[in-house]
A protein has these predicted regions:
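Hydrophobic alpha-helical segments of integral membrane proteins
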Residues: 1-16
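Soluble cytosolic regulatory domains appended to membrane proteins
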Residues: 19-183
Length: 183
């Protein structure tokens, strides 16, 4: 009975003071890296596996602005562009998705997928506006992990990257993230 009374009173004091007790053992990132390093040295883990694990941890510290395709390298289509002009541009620069803008890149109208272009480009009354899809936007200072979560939950493979003023800074794709992990 005395031990029970002592335990109960100790728990009551802990609850009243707001202290939290934890019996869990928490493993840090550095401990995991050390275990992986030791496994690699012992031959239990391949170096390529160690490299991927380290890249996963490093990816958590990165922002999408550091892995995106910059706006200066971005191929985009003008909303009123002719079918012939689009065809030539796409032949030279094959991508899965193209931003579509009005007059300048910061005036995004939406995006168009390559497969939609193939399906409609030869139609006599082709208009880019007819096959537009809504664009997805991510702030450039968003973490890669957070972006990956959005890409996964929204079932999309890209996002246009904006600065704090809403200007387009580039595009990030699921492929960019995979390239950082495996590249």
């Amino acid at each position: 009975p005395f031990v029970w009374l002592l335990s109960a009173s100790t728990q009551a004091v802990i609850r009243l003071t707001g202290l939290h007790t934890s019996t869990e053992n928490k493993v840090t990132e550095e401990e995991i890296k050390a275990i992986i390093q030791e496994g690699t040295e012992d031959g239990e883990i391949q170096e390529v596996e160690q490299d991927i694990v380290e890249k996963v941890f490093n990816l958590g510290d990165r922002k999408i602005g550091s892995i995106m395709t910059h706006r200066s390298d971005l191929i985009w289509l003008e909303i009123g562009e002719s079918a012939e002009s689009i065809r030539n541009k796409v032949k030279e620069n094959v991508y899965t998705v193209y931003p579509v803008a009005h007059d300048e890149l910061d005036h995004i109208e939406g995006v168009v997928y390559l497969k939609d272009l193939f399906s409609h480009l030869d139609e006599p009354d082709f208009k880019l506006a007819d096959i537009l899809r809504p664009a997805q936007f991510f702030p450039e200072n968003q973490s890669v992990y957070n972006t990956l979560g959005h890409l996964k939950s929204d079932h999309i493979k890209y996002g246009l990257v904006t600065d704090e003023f809403g200007s387009i800074q580039g595009i990030v794709t699921l492929k960019d993230i995979v390239d950082v992990l495996l590249g």
